[in-house]
Regions:
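Metal-dependent nucleic-acid phosphoesterase active-site entry motif
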Residues: 4-14
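A short acidic, helix-capping loop that chelates divalent metal ions and anchors anionic groups
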Residues: 13-16, 50-53, 137-139
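Glycine-rich, small/polar surface segments that engage phosphate groups of diverse ligands
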Residues: 47-51, 61
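Active-site-adjacent betaalpha module
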Residues: 3, 30-33, 55-175
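Catalytic metal-binding/acid-base residues of hydrolase active sites
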Residues: 10, 48-49, 108, 134
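A short alpha/beta connector and helix-capping loop motif
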Residues: 17-48
Length: 175
């Protein structure tokens, strides 16, 4: 069984301009529509921030972007750390659903997406990164494009414990 993880695509995450945000949202929507038709679970991950930072539970900025397609039978997992597996119910849910393969997309490439990829790797999940389905912002020492390209390259070239990570564009999956 497979599942799609949509990480931190929250209103507050996009108060900072993100690289090709509209295109990323469009790609995630296309992929989620395709996977729902195949009865593949869609799991939205939401970061719970603190009053000292942002993404505080229950606030407008904590909500999933309204432009993302959500269905009532989609799953939602809250997290407090970058890695979706750290002190959350995700692993229990994935085991209950019989999931062994993850499609991973979302925000931010260099933080929560990357941390979750590594969390999934050490748990021996088969992983497909949605190459055009994750985004980030410019950082002090690298542009968003550089960070996205760098992480896509690293993920494609990692030597994980079982199977290699696939890095594919949306159209390669939905064709």
């Amino acid at each position: 069984m497979e599942a799609l993880l949509i990480i931190d695509m929250q209103v507050g995450s996009f108060q900072t301009p993100r690289f090709e945000a509209e295109k990323v949202i469009e790609n995630i929507n296309c992929l989620s529509i395709f996977l729902r038709k195949k009865n593949i679970p869609i799991i939205f991950i939401q970061h719970d921030g603190t009053k000292e930072n942002f993404l505080v539970y229950g606030t407008d900025e904590w909500n999933i972007l309204p432009s993302l397609i959500q269905e009532t039978n989609d799953y939602r997992i809250e997290k407090e750390a970058n890695d979706c597996f750290y002190k959350t119910e995700i692993e229990t849910l994935l085991k209950k659903l019989g999931v062994q393969k993850l499609y991973i997309c979302g925000c931010a490439t260099d933080f929560c997406v990357n941390a979750t990829v590594h969390g999934a790797l050490v748990r021996d999940y088969t992983i497909t990164i949605i190459k055009d389905g994750h985004t980030t912002a410019d950082r002090p020492h690298a542009t968003a494009v550089q960070l996205i390209d760098f992480h896509n390259w690293v993920w494609e070239n990692l030597t994980p414990t079982q199977s290699r990570i696939e890095v594919k564009n949306t159209h390669e999956i939905i064709q």
